[in-house]
Design a protein with these regions (language model features):
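N-terminal capping/lid subdomain adjacent to the active-site entrance of alpha/beta enzymes
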Residues: 1-154, 179-180, 273-319
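Glycine-enriched alpha-helix->loop->beta-strand junction motifs that scaffold or abut catalytic
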Residues: 96-99, 126-128, 149-157, 174-185, ...
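Shared catalytic-loop signature of beta/alpha-barrel
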Residues: 60-61, 195-294, 303
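Active-site-adjacent beta->alpha loops and helix N-cap segments on the catalytic face
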Residues: 107-125, 139-143, 163-177, 194-196, ...
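Catalytic beta/alpha-barrel core
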Residues: 100-111, 130-137, 155-167, 182-193, ...
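Solvent-exposed, charged interface segments at domain starts and junctions
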Residues: 2-14, 176-209
Length: 319
């Protein structure tokens, strides 16, 4: 049974977390956290998402807070995430012991020359690391093929994530690269923001599925999608707080994820709980209890709190 708005909001804390670096064009991360009977849950769809899409994020928060996450334990290998910045070395210092990195490319303010410079710097500083790049749907097919060939001259990539917008375009990029550099393709938005998340597998459009708990509606739903896709998987954060990271770690453990994109707490100046330690490039699957003092210090103003409360009400209509 879906909880009511009153059930959720009576347990809610709205927080604003300052970012250490600009990421996805934002400098603060807002989230509504739910202190539920089964644990803490998170509702933090990006502000531009309409209620129909954001509702999956609410379902994920409800799963964690009211139903409870599936049982999992142990350790998960993680990747470091490098924004589009010239100060690559400073960001690397946030990820001690990590041997896989995801580099953001194709940002609106950046050129392919910029991307190549950042990739070259990263590869020079971490020559033995596995490197994946993420274009967030920015390229045409021709641009993606050009970039893949340029990147291949710097180093072999683990994969290029979501180079183009549609599954059909990903399939064409993959076909054109197969006889040349053969760089693998990963799908993210073509799974989590698509009407048919299984189209990428049907078209042979990807080698790897990048799956995020909140946009897919929770750990249970993510595991179902992964099983049906039949692809290798990388579980990643949707820029989650420490609370949302719990679900990501559980999902990564249950699905046998490649190095998971779950070390993103290090992109925040402050979070509601201390960053999980990364030990030899891995993080432990544990549950987080936010620090009451941090919840108070990071609480949103009344206007933003009310905005998030209304967003919960709007999204409940789609569950």
């Amino acid at each position: 049974m879906t909880p009511t708005a009153d059930d959720i909001l009576s347990r809610a804390h709205v927080v604003v977390l300052p970012m250490a670096v600009r990421f996805r064009g934002i400098t603060v991360r807002e989230a509504l956290l739910i202190d539920g009977p089964a644990g803490w849950g998170e509702f933090s769809p990006f502000v531009e998402y309409e209620p129909a899409e954001a509702a999956a994020w609410l379902a994920s928060g409800i799963e964690a807070a009211f139903t409870g996450l599936p049982e999992a334990s142990g350790w998960v290998e993680v990747n470091g995430t490098i924004p589009a910045t010239d100060d690559v070395e400073a960001v690397l210092e946030r990820f001690p012991g990590v041997s896989t990195f995801k580099l953001k490319v194709a940002e609106s303010s950046q050129s392919l020359t910029d991307d190549l410079r950042h990739l070259t710097t990263l590869h020079t500083l971490r020559p033995n690391a596995r490197i994946r790049v993420d274009a967030n749907r920015a390229w045409s097919v021709d641009e993606a093929v050009e970039a893949a060939h340029a990147f291949a001259k710097v180093c072999d990539l683990e994969y290029i994530e979501q180079p183009c917008a549609t599954a059909e375009e990903l399939a064409e990029v993959r076909r054109r690269l197969a006889s040349t550099v053969a760089t693998p393709i990963a799908a993210d938005e073509s799974i989590r923001r698509a009407e048919d998340p299984f189209k990428v597998a049907q078209l042979g459009a990807a080698d790897v599925a990048v799956c995020k708990v909140a946009p897919l509606g929770g750990v249970g739903r993510l595991c179902g999608v992964v099983d049906k896709l039949g692809l290798d998987v990388t579980v990643a954060s949707a820029l989650d707080t420490a609370v949302g990271m719990d679900a990501g770690l559980v999902a990564a453990k249950l699905t046998g994820s490649r190095a998971a994109g779950l070390a993103t707490q290090r992109l925040f100046v402050e979070d509601v709980a201390a960053p999980r330690p990364v030990v030899d490039g891995r993080m432990e699957v544990t549950r987080t209890t936010p620090d009451p003092a941090r919840l108070h210090e990071l609480r949103a103003g009344e206007q933003r709190r009310d905005w998030w409360y209304q967003r919960v009400r709007d999204c409940l209509d789609f569950l």
